[in-house]
C-alpha cells in the first residue's frame, strides 16, 4: 500500500497555516473546483503555483486573482501569450512543458501538490513530487496506471504521501480509516454507467460525440467523460486501486450504480461493507484531500436520502463496454501493457472527440494495440515515455492520421 497520511498520526504539516499549494491542471475541471474550495477557505491556503497547459486565457485570469509566484504552460507560444495577458507589474516565473511542470511539483515553497493534469501528461510532475517528499493530492490516475511501481518506491524512499482525489478512491480511503488493512477482503468501485447505460452494441454503433459527452451525473472534462461512457475510466481506476491499496486485480470489484450517490465500498473479512455516500460533486473529495485531517464545508448541496430515493446496483455490461476487461487484461499481463492501454485509449478518445472514428472503434483500437505489443517492459520513466510515444505513433498510423498528441 502506498504510504498514506493516515499512517502518520501527527504529520508536521498538519498545523501549517496556510497550506502552500501547487495546482497543476488548474484550468481543468478538477483544478477549477479546487480553486473554488480555496476561495471558500482563503485563510487555510496560499497558492504558490498554477499550471494550465493550453487554456492560457483562463490561467491568466486565475493568476490575476491568486498572484502565485509560478505559472506553467505547454509551450513557448503559450508563455508569450500569458505574459501579455498578465496585469502590469506582476511578473511570475513561467515554466514550460512537462519538465516545467515537474519543476513546479518540486518547489520548496509548495508543500502540497495537486496533480490534476489530464492523461499521461501528468506523469512527470507526479513522479517528481513523489521523489521530493510532497503531499500529493492525486487526481491524475494515469500516473499510477503507467508507473505505479516506480511512484510507490519513490514514496517509500522520500516520505511522500498520496491522497486520492478520484471520488471512488477517496471514498475507499475514507472507508479504510481506523481499520487494519489486513482485515480488508475486497474493494468495490461504483460506476455510473455513463450516458449509454443499458444500450446494446447495436445501439452504440450510431452514437455521436455529443451524445457521449452528456454525462448524467458528473461535470467533468471531455476526455474523462468519454472514458466514463466506454467504462475505460473504471478500468483505469481498477488498476489505480491495485497500486494504491496493495490489492490484487481480482480483489477489486465494479458495480454500476446509476445514481452516483454511493461512491465506493470496502468489504471486510467479517462480511460487513462500509460505503461512502455523498452528492456527486468533486469538491467533496478535493476539500477532503486539501484539508486532511480536518474537514471543512465543501460548498456542495447536502445529500437527502429521502429525496434521492432508491439506490440501485447492477453488473457492468462487458459485451457492450469491453474497455473495463481490456484494462484488467493489461494489468494482469503486465510487460508494459498498461502503458500501451493508456496510450491507445488517449489516441482513440482524441480521434473520437474530433469525429474521426466511431464510438465502438475506441475499444477495437485499444484491443489491437494490446495484441500488437511486443512485450517491451519499461523500467524507468524514460522507458515508459518511449513506449507511450511508440504506441501513439502506431495507433495514429493504423488509423490513417498524423500523431498530434503525446505526453506533453
UniProtKB/Swiss-Prot annotation:
Membrane-spanning segments: none
Stored SUPFAM superfamilies: 1-deoxy-D-xylulose-5-phosphate reductoisomerase, C-terminal domain, Glyceraldehyde-3-phosphate dehydrogenase-like, C-terminal domain, NAD(P)-binding Rossmann-fold domains
Residues involved in 1-deoxy-D-xylulose 5-phosphate binding: 141, 167-168, 192, 215, 228, 233-234, 237
Residues annotated to bind Mn(2+): 166, 168, 237
Enzyme class: oxidoreductase
Cofactor(s) essential for the protein: Mg(2+); Mn(2+)
Keywords: Isoprene biosynthesis, Manganese, Metal-binding, NADP, Oxidoreductase
A single GO BP: isopentenyl diphosphate biosynthetic process, methylerythritol 4-phosphate pathway involved in terpenoid biosynthetic process
Disulfide bonds: none
EC number, UniProt record: 1.1.1.267
Record bears the keyword Manganese: yes
Signal peptide positions on this chain: none
Pathway: Isoprenoid biosynthesis; isopentenyl diphosphate biosynthesis via DXP pathway; isopentenyl diphosphate from 1-deoxy-D-xylulose 5-phosphate: step 1/6
One Pfam short name: DXP_redisom_C
Superkingdom, taxonomy of origin: Bacteria
Binding of NADPH, residues: 27-30, 53-55, 140, 142, 221
UniProt family annotation: Belongs to the DXR family.
Function as written in the Swiss-Prot or TrEMBL entry: Catalyzes the NADPH-dependent rearrangement and reduction of 1-deoxy-D-xylulose-5-phosphate (DXP) to 2-C-methyl-D-erythritol 4-phosphate (MEP).
HAMAP family on file: DXP_reductoisom
Stated name of the protein: 1-deoxy-D-xylulose 5-phosphate reductoisomerase
Organism field: Nitratidesulfovibrio vulgaris (strain DP4)
Amino acid at each position: 500500500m502506498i504510504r498514506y497520511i493516515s499512517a502518520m498520526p501527527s504529520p508536521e504539516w498538519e498545523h501549517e497555516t496556510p497550506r502552500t499549494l501547487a495546482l497543476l491542471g488548474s484550468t481543468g475541471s478538477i483544478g477549477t473546483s479546487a480553486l473554488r474550495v480555496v476561495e471558500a477557505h482563503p485563510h487555510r491556503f496560499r497558492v504558490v503555483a498554477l499550471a494550465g497547459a493550453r487554456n492560457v486565457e483562463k490561467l491568466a485570469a486565475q493568476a490575476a486573482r491568486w498572484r502565485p509566484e509560478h505559472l506553467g504552460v505547454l509551450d513557448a507560444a503559450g508563455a508569450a501569450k500569458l505574459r501579455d495577458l498578465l496585469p502590469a507589474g506582476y511578473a511570475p516565473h513561467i515554466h514550460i512543458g512537462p519538465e516545467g511542470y515537474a519543476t513546479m511539483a518540486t518547489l520548496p515553497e509548495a508543500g502540497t501538490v495537486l496533480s490534476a493534469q489530464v492523461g499521461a501528461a501528468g506523469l512527470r510532475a507526479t513522479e517528481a513530487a513523489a521523489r521530493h517528499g510532497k503531499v500529493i493530492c492525486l487526481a491524475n490516475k494515469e500516473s499510477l496506471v503507467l508507473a505505479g511501481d516506480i511512484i510507490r518506491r519513490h514514496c517509500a524512499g522520500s516520505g511522500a504521501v498520496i491522497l486520492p482525489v478520484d471520488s471512488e478512491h477517496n471514498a475507499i480511503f475514507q472507508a479504510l480509516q481506523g481499520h487494519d488493512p489486513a482485515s480488508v477482503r475486497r474493494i468495490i468501485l461504483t460506476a455510473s454507467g455513463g450516458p449509454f447505460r443499458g444500450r446494446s452494441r447495436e445501439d452504440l454503433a450510431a452514437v455521436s460525440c455529443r451524445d457521449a459527452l452528456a454525462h448524467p451525473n458528473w461535470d467533468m472534462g471531455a476526455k474523462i467523460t468519454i472514458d466514463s461512457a466506454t467504462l475505460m475510466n473504471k478500468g483505469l481506476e481498477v488498476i489505480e486501486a491495485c497500486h494504491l491499496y496493495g490489492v490484487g486485480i481480482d480483489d477489486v470489484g465494479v458495480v454500476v450504480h446509476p445514481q452516483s450517490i454511493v461512491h465506493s465500498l470496502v468489504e471486510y473479512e467479517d462480511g460487513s461493507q462500509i460505503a461512502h455516500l455523498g452528492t456527486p460533486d468533486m469538491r467533496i473529495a478535493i476539500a477532503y484531500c486539501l484539508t486532511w485531517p480536518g474537514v471543512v464545508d465543501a460548498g456542495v448541496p447536502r445529500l437527502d436520502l429521502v429525496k434521492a430515493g432508491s439506490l440501485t446496483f447492477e453488473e457492468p455490461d462487458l459485451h457492450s463496454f469491453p474497455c473495463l476487461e481490456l484494462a484488467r487484461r493489461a494489468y494482469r499481463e503486465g510487460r508494459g501493457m498498461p502503458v500501451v492501454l493508456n496510450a491507445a485509449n488517449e489516441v482513440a478518445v482524441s480521434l473520437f472527440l474530433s469525429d474521426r472514428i466511431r464510438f465502438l472503434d475506441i475499444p477495437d483500437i485499444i484491443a489491437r494495440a494490446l495484441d500488437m505489443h511486443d512485450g517491451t517492459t519499461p523500467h524507468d520513466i524514460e522507458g515508459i515515455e518511449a513506449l507511450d510515444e511508440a504506441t501513439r505513433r502506431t495507433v495514429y498510423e493504423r488509423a490513417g492520421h498524423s500523431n498530434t498528441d503525446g505526453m506533453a
